[in-house]
Amino acid sequence: MRSLTLRITALIAALLTATCIAAPVSSYTIVAKYPHSTDSYTEGFFYLDGLFYEGTGLNGHSAITVTQPETGKSLQRLGIPQQYFGEGIVDWGPNLYEWTWTSHICFVYDRFSLREVKRFTYTGEGWGMTRTENEIITSDGTSTLRFRDPNTFKEIRHIVVKDGATKIDQLNELEYIKGEIYANIWHSDRIARISPLDGHVISWIDLTGLLPEDQKVNAESVLNGIAYDKQHDRLFVTGKQWPAIFEIKITPPTKPR
C-alpha cells in the first residue's frame, strides 16, 4: 500500500487539479452498469474481444483476471507471487504485459493461456500502462508519461503532462482512445485527456458522484480503471474495489471550473 506521505501528496495534487485547471471540463451520463468484484484492487484495465481484462494490486492479492462483462463471471485468473504488487496491464499481439509497482519487473504472458513467456526489467516505479499502434505508454505516479519499445520495454521518448502551466502528477491507470491518452489521477474524481504529442491536457472528465461514497470499501477505493470498446465506441470506468463497472457517455465540455 502506498505510504501516508504519498497519500498526502496525492490529496494536495487533487486539490490543485480541481482549483488550477485551464482546460475545459466535461461531465458524464451513465449508459449501463456491470458487476465488478470488490476484491479487485484495480491497477490495470482494458476491453478486448468482448471481455474485460483486469490487473489487480496489493501484495499477496495481485492477479490478472479475464471476465465476462454482463455477468462478471471470471473466465480466467492468474495470481502472481506475493512479493509482487501488480500494476498496469496492456495487450500486445498475442501477449499481455503486466508490470509491478516497485519490483522493476514487467511480466509478459501469452494472452490466451496466461502462461509467462518472458520478463523485462526497468528503473523507477510502475503505475499505469496503455498502447498506441507502435508503442507502449506508461505512467509512474509523476507528471511524466514514457513511450516504450514493446520489443525491449526501453524508453523511446517521454512527455510531461501540463494543464496550462501546471504540471499534473499522480498519473495512474491509462487508456489510449482516438489519438488521446486518458489518465486517471490518483485520489481524484477526474480523468485527464492528454495530447500524446506534447502532453498538454486537452480537457477533463469530471466523474464526481459516479459511485456513492457509502458504496466504497475504504479511503483507497478510488477511481482507477479506464477501458474502451473501439468497435462499438463504448467507454468503461471503474475503481479500486468498486462494486460496479460503469459504461458512460461524455457530455460536451464547459469552461474550466
Residue ranges of model-derived segments:
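Short loop/turn segments that connect beta-strands within beta-propeller blades
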Residues: 67-72, 110-114, 150-153, 195-199, ...
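Blade-loop segments of beta-propeller domains
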Residues: 71-109, 114-126
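A short helix->beta-strand "capping" segment at the edge of beta-propeller domains
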Residues: 23-39, 69-73
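Beta-strand-rich domains and repeat architectures in extracellular enzymes and scaffolds
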Residues: 31-63, 78-90, 239-241
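Hydrophobic, well-structured mid-protein blocks that either form specific transmembrane helices
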Residues: 106-164
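Surface-exposed loop and turn segments in beta-propeller and other repeat-based domains
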Residues: 32-34, 75, 79-82, 158-167, ...
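Beta-rich, blade/repeat-based domains predominating
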Residues: 38-49, 82-93, 122-135, 165-179, ...
